[in-house]
Design a protein with these regions (language model features):
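N-terminal nucleophile
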Residues: 2-16, 20-121, 125
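Conserved small/polar residues in nucleotide/adenosyl-binding loops
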Residues: 127-133
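Solvent-exposed, charged interface segments at domain starts and junctions
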Residues: 1-2, 130
Length: 133
C-alpha cells in the first residue's frame, strides 16, 4: 500500500462488506458512496463512517444500522480518523468493524418503524418447496 492509499471497509446494501485499499482522495470516496460525502464519527475511537450526504433524501436503500434507531442509506466506507485526514484502519479496527457490519441487513416495515434482520446476499430459492406441493 502506498502512502496515497488507505485501508478501508466498504459496505454495500445487501452484500457482505469488503476490505479494500483505495486512493486517499475525495473523488475515490465519492465514487464509492455515489455522491457527495458526509463524515460521521459514531464511536469514541478514531474511526469515521463516510456515507452519501443525501442518501436517505435520494431514496437509497437502507444498508446497516447506525446506532439503535437509525440506519445508513446506500453504500458507505469505514476508515480511520486522523484528525484532519482520513487514514487507514488498524488491524484491530478492521477486526471490530468487520464483525459489526459483516452481515447484510434487510429492513422489514412494521407499524412501529423498520425492523432490521440479518440476512445473506444470496437469493433465496423456493424450488425445493414446490416439489412437495
Amino acid at each position: 500500500m502506498s502512502e496515497n492509499e488507505i485501508r478501508v471497509l466498504y459496505v454495500q446494501p445487501g452484500k457482505y462488506l469488503e476490505e479494500r485499499t483505495i486512493p486517499n482522495t475525495l473523488r475515490a470516496l465519492q465514487e464509492l458512496v455515489g455522491g457527495d460525502i458526509e463524515c460521521c464519527r459514531p464511536w469514541r475511537d478514531s474511526v469515521c463512517v463516510i456515507c452519501n450526504d443525501s442518501g436517505k433524501i435520494d431514496g437509497l436503500p437502507p444498508n446497516r444500522l447506525y446506532g439503535h434507531t437509525d440506519f445508513l442509506a446506500g453504500s458507505f466506507v469505514v476508515c480511520g480518523n486522523g484528525g484532519e485526514d482520513f487514514i487507514s484502519l488498524t488491524d484491530r479496527q478492521v477486526f471490530l468493524y468487520e464483525r459489526l457490519y459483516h452481515n447484510p441487513v434487510v429492513f422489514l416495515p412494521t407499524p412501529h418503524g423498520l425492523l432490521p434482520m440479518k440476512c445473506t446476499p444470496e437469493p433465496v430459492s423456493y424450488t425445493h418447496l414446490r416439489a412437495h406441493e
